[in-house]
Regions:
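Short intracellular "coupling" helices and adjacent cytoplasmic loop segments at the cytosolic face
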Residues: 1-6
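Alpha-helical transmembrane bundle of multi-pass membrane proteins
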Residues: 8-280
Length: 280
């Protein structure tokens, strides 16, 4: 990667966004024109992370105790969960280089749907029978691993890549606010679901987060684009053209065919809209 070319492309992207009047001075710009779609994706990516069921893993020690484990076993299982979470996070470094963000995000929502449905069914059918606690414990540990392998780290990549360069800071700030609101709801609801003196639904809480994960999965399938290997300029082109979600992966090939990426910096600057013609 040539650093000078990268900097020149960033400057070129900024000039293009100025030409398109993307704004950048007000939070209202986040909801104007094509920026509205980018704001939606950034906010929903973080909300999906909050609703994917990982709140169960954050309350793992308490969840394990309510599932029937003693305090010592609950602590040991929680430590095991954190261990596999670290392993998943390390493995995600490699996956992000070779697997698309969209695939990882969809996988990170589909797997919880399956695991949480299994957890809910086990809780209903087995109740407090021997073996049910270990099955739920294994599901929570698996949830921790797959969360840190997929949706956990990928969310931060998406939220940084989706916004326009001139509105990135404001978009990330707003997306984080929406995430915090979702987490506040989780922090209110989760203790009540597990507390024996409140709702006391125990493992049946898995059904709730299986439902929210499924809704998020449907949204991501239709609305979350693939951003891997796309520059900010290429993303600007796609969003400005109102490209369908399924078309984002095709832009790289189209630009290669028009030789735009092989042009020198001088040639690119003389042909500012060449990239647009590649996606017409």
């Amino acid at each position: 990667m040539d650093i000078d070319d990268t900097i020149e492309l960033m400057q070129h992207t900024n000039r293009v966004e100025k030409t398109l009047k993307y704004g950048g001075g007000s939070y209202l710009d986040l909801f104007k024109g094509v920026n509205r779609r980018r704001t939606e994706i950034a906010c929903m990516a973080w909300i999906c992370q909050a609703l994917s069921g990982w709140s169960l893993t954050s309350y793992a020690p308490y969840f394990f105790e309510q599932a029937g484990f003693d305090a010592s076993s609950s602590f040991n299982l929680s430590v095991a969960g954190y261990g596999v979470g670290i392993l998943g996070g390390i493995m995600s470094w490699t996956l992000l280089s070779f697997v698309g963000r969209r695939k990882l995000y969809l996988s990170g929502l589909l797997i919880p749907v399956i695991l949480l449905l299994a957890g809910g069914i086990i809780s209903v059918t087995l109740g407090s029978r021997r073996g049910a606690d270990w099955a739920l414990g294994a599901i929570i540990i698996a949830m921790t691993f797959f969360y840190d392998l997929t949706i956990g780290p990928v969310c931060y990549v998406l939220v940084a890549e989706i916004p326009s360069t001139r509105l990135r800071v404001k978009t990330v700030a707003l997306a984080r606010v929406t995430y915090n609101i979702a987490i506040m709801v989780n922090n209110i609801v989760m203790p009540k679901m597990l507390n024996p003196s409140a709702w006391n639904i125990g493992g049946k809480a898995c059904f709730l987060y299986a439902s929210t994960s499924f809704v998020c999965l449907i949204w991501c399938y239709f609305r979350l684009p693939e951003t891997r290997k796309l520059t900010y300029l290429e993303l600007d082109i796609l969003f400005e053209k109102k490209a369908p979600t399924s078309k984002f992966k095709e832009l790289q090939d189209r630009l290669d065919e028009t030789a735009y990426l092989s042009m020198t910096r001088t040639e690119q600057l003389r042909s500012r809209w060449h990239g647009w013609l590649a996606y017409s």
